[in-house]
């Protein structure tokens, strides 16, 4: 509040003396700021002038609550790509804040204030505003654990002696990857991003196809004692409800993959299956990168 009053007085003084108010910068929040207790949280802005991004600025910010006095919180922002500036700041509580920015370039300083409502996050990341939660991460961890158990049981049936020992040692080393948050997030973002692309292309979820895929998974899992035991411990109804939701996205993605295979065959009718599938996979990865870049993804 004090910062806003001081800025108003400075602007009034400029008007009275006929001085220029300096560059006409506009600040847009490109990544929202959320509150987590005892943790500095990331945020990002874009600075514009006449609808063009402004590069080469030195940017600092001071946050203060709009309606209460809980002191101020300062941060220095680092320049990124295309006129973006990012930083981390630890706030005392959620609520309405005034963010007073100081933007400096060529020795000239400009001050701008924006108001924002800082809320508690509903998850650990979001894609176009749709949250990825810790529960989502836990489910993906469990799915990966099931796959490890399948590989372990399969190895015991397939190998003997030293070869079995080496395979089991390798699988044991993979267990630490189960808790890799970045890998789990990447899996979720890849799946959900491409499912969103499928919907954008007009594809729909066919419940019959989903149930068909679920039955295939049930048949596979039923062959492994350790997998059945883990699912029972997780809660069978809970597991299959989540798995069914997962396969709604997978069925959508399969339609995109079929489109790409059909296009690859059309582009090169003399190509063999291996070449067609390779070309389709390359196109899929290109589409994935393009889709992810087009989405507003926030990772906390």
Question: Which residue ranges define each predicted feature?
Answer:
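Beta-strand-rich structural segments
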Residues: 33, 37-53
């Amino acid at each position: 509040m004090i910062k806003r009053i001081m800025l108003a007085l400075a602007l009034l003084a400029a008007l009275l003396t006929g001085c220029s108010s300096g560059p006409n910068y506009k600040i847009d929040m490109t990544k929202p700021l959320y509150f987590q207790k005892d943790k500095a949280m990331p945020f990002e802005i874009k600075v514009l002038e006449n609808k063009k991004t402004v590069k080469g600025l030195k940017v600092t910010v001071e946050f203060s609550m709009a309606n209460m006095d809980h002191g101020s919180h300062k941060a220095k922002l680092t320049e990124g790509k295309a006129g973006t500036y990012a930083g981390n700041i630890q706030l005392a509580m959620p609520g309405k804040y005034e963010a007073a920015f100081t933007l400096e370039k060529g020795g000239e300083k400009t001050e701008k204030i924006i108001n924002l409502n800082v809320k508690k996050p509903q998850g650990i990341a979001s894609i176009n505003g749709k949250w990825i939660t810790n529960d989502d991460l836990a489910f993906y961890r469990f799915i990966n654990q099931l796959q490890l158990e399948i590989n372990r049981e399969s190895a015991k049936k397939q190998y003997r002696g030293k070869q079995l020992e080496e395979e089991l040692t390798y699988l044991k080393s993979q267990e630490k990857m189960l808790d890799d948050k970045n890998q789990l997030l990447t899996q979720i973002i890849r799946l959900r991003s491409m499912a969103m692309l499928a919907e954008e292309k007009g594809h729909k979820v066919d419940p019959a196809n989903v149930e068909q895929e679920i039955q295939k998974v049930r048949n596979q899992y039923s062959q492994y004692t350790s997998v059945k035991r883990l699912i029972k411990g997780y809660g069978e109804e809970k597991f299959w409800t989540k798995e069914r939701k997962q396969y709604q996205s997978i069925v959508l993605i399969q339609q995109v993959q079929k489109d790409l295979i059909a296009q690859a065959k059309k582009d090169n009718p003399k190509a063999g299956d291996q070449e067609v599938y390779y070309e389709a996979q390359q196109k899929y990865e290109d589409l994935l990168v393009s889709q992810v870049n087009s989405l507003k993804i926030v990772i906390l």
